[in-house]
Amino acid sequence: MISKPDKNKLRLKRHRRVRGKISGTAERPRLSVFRSNTNIYAQLIDDVAGVTLASASTLDKSVSKDATKVEQAQAVGKAIAEAGKAKGITEVVFDRGGYIYHGRVKALADAARENGLEF
């Protein structure tokens, strides 16, 4: 019988490999993205101090539940960019979390760029 590779295990493997190479600082935090089946989450993380500086997700009240998943991801990207600007953050290191740069992850990244984050 042919064994099918577990997609989440492969994603976690990619994520660990990338995390070994990138790290966020207070001046240039890591924009970490996590995608579940129903929601998407974004955090600005200072890896040196080990703290989350700002976060946004589809669970926030500002994000419409009636919108499509891609539209919700765009709203989260806008929200995380605004939260970062409020804390004086303009440059980040993008961590796609092992996900393919497509769909909801790309929509979040593009919206964050349009609203003032540079990466």
Swiss-Prot record:
Gene3D superfamilies given in the database record: 3.30.420.100
Domain of life: Bacteria
One Gene Ontology molecular-function label: structural constituent of ribosome
Keywords: Ribonucleoprotein, Ribosomal protein, RNA-binding, rRNA-binding
UniProt GO cellular component terms: cytosolic large ribosomal subunit
InterPro entries per UniProt: Ribosomal_uL18_bac-type, Ribosomal_uL18_bac/euk
Biological processes annotated in GO: translation
Keyword field contains Transmembrane: no
Family: Belongs to the universal ribosomal protein uL18 family.
Task performed by this protein: This is one of the proteins that bind and probably mediate the attachment of the 5S RNA into the large ribosomal subunit, where it forms part of the central protuberance.
Subunit text: Part of the 50S ribosomal subunit; part of the 5S rRNA/L5/L18/L25 subcomplex. Contacts the 5S and 23S rRNAs.
Name under which the protein is recorded: Large ribosomal subunit protein uL18
Taxonomic path: Bacteria, Bacillati, Bacillota, Bacilli, Lactobacillales
